[in-house]
């Protein structure tokens, strides 16, 4: 199988880093275009009346406090049936179409360049940098991997388009990586590949919840994912299997809840292998193979066994958030910054700083069924001493 790169993606003087076929990316504009939220008003009680401010302050209460929604309404950010509504006490009619336009804002810094590690007619594998979100959410609506995939001109031969009726206009990610996590991200070019790859990841999560021998689970999987991580403390055992369930807990600043170690959560399985014990720093370099793909699974599992990732701002020992008490925020300041949304002052899942890299994976190709391996080059801090020496030799150091 070939992994052909598009010729001339970048100038020769800007050659991609070792291990990459080519790089692409469009610099971010200073401000995004804002975003619109559309609702159709339905009255639960025919005898009751609901005002505009009541609707938004209850339906979107995690977005802003009551004064925040009053400000948005008076600033003309909401329309009702196509007309700007500036009266918070306006009575809503059944079936009214409500549109809230979140004003353009300057999103926090995020890298924009992506390295292509593998590419064929069905899928593409990217090396995602730390600090770049995969899909739009919260403050990051434009500065995402998905946006870069949409911005790139994916030139495909007409013969390919005619043969592949399921071809998509651009590749789409088929799994998650945390914003602070770097490394391998698989994206599908066709609807068939998307469905097949998504099924592989879902199958892993399902198998993690079954009482089966580890060897049987490994044989059943169509994809195996391996990460590198740097954790606090010295792990005594060379290998550790973690099976702590992961579920949602209440957490200020995260409306849908925060994923954490939770006895009532969903099954999750992580296999940890020690690579080096860095006793002078009281750190351990590890490889983690995940048999499921729960959100923030590695961060939670390592914290659960008493070895949080080095510099993880959110998860502490026990796999729980380090902070759980609400903090006062300045409504006026938050509106000025991001068009009306409050920035949580406490750490949230998207905050960076920890050292976690999706290093390599082996998968059954979604159309050929061939087993292939793809590797993302390691950051220096996540290399073993021997790997660092080998890298220095390659670079002529």
From Swiss-Prot:
**Top-level taxonomic group:** Eukaryota
Which leading EC class covers this enzyme? isomerase
* Catalytic activity, reaction form: a uridine in RNA = a pseudouridine in RNA
PROSITE patterns, A to Z: PSI_RLU
User: What Pfam families does UniProt report for this protein, alphabetically?
Assistant: PseudoU_synth_2
Q: Which GO terms describe its molecular function?
A: pseudouridine synthase activity; RNA binding
Keywords in alphabetical order, please: Isomerase, RNA-binding
| Enzyme Commission designation | 5.4.99.-
Give all cystine bridges in this chain: none
PANTHER family for this protein:
MITOCHONDRIAL RNA PSEUDOURIDINE SYNTHASE, RNA PSEUDOURIDINE SYNTHASE 5
| Record-stated family | Belongs to the pseudouridine synthase RluA family.
- This chain's protein is named RNA pseudouridine synthase 5
Gene source species: Oryza sativa subsp. japonica
């Amino acid at each position: 199988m070939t992994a052909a790169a598009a010729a001339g993606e970048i100038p020769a003087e800007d050659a991609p880093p070792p291990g990459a076929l080519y790089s692409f990316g469009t610099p971010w504009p200073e401000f995004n275009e804002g975003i619109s939220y559309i609702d159709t008003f339905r009255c639960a009680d025919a005898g009751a009346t609901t005002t505009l401010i009541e609707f938004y302050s209850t339906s979107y209460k995690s977005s802003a406090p009551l004064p925040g929604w009053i400000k948005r309404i008076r600033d003309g950010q909401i329309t009702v049936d196509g007309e700007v509504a500036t009266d918070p006490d306006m009575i809503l009619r059944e079936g009214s179409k409500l549109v809230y336009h979140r004003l353009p804002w300057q999103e926090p810094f995020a890298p924009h360049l992506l390295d292509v590690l593998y590419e064929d007619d069905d899928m593409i594998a990217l090396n995602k940098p730390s600090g770049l979100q995969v899909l739009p959410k919260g403050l990051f609506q434009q500065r995402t991997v998905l946006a870069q995939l949409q911005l790139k001109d994916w030139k495909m031969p007409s013969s390919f388009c005619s043969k592949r009726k399921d071809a998509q206009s651009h590749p789409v990610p088929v799994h998650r990586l945390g914003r602070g996590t770097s490394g391998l991200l698989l994206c599908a070019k066709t609807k068939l590949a998307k469905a097949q790859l998504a099924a592989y990841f879902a199958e892993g999560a399902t198998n993690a919840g079954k009482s089966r021998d580890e060897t049987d689970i490994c044989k059943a999987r169509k994809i195996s994912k391996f990460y590198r991580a740097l954790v606090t403390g010295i792990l005594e055992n060379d290998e550790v299997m973690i099976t702590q369930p992961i579920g949602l807990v209440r957490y200020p600043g995260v409306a849908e809840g925060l994923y954490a170690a939770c006895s009532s959560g969903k099954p999750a399985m992580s296999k940890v292998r020690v690579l080096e014990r860095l006793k002078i720093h009281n750190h351990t370099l590890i490889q983690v193979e995940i048999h499921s793909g729960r959100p923030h699974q590695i961060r939670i599992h390592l914290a659960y066994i008493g070895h949080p990732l080095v510099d993880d701002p959110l998860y502490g020992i026990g796999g729980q958030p380090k902070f759980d008490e609400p903090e006062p925020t300045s409504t006026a300041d938050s509106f000025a910054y991001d068009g009306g949304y409050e920035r949580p002052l406490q750490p949230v899942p998207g905050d960076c700083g920890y050292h976690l890299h999706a290093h390599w994976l082996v998968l059954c190709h979604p159309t050929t069924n061939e087993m292939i391996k793809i590797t993302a080059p390691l950051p220096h801090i996540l290399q073993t001493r021997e790997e660092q020496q080998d890298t220095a030799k390659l670079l002529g150091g």
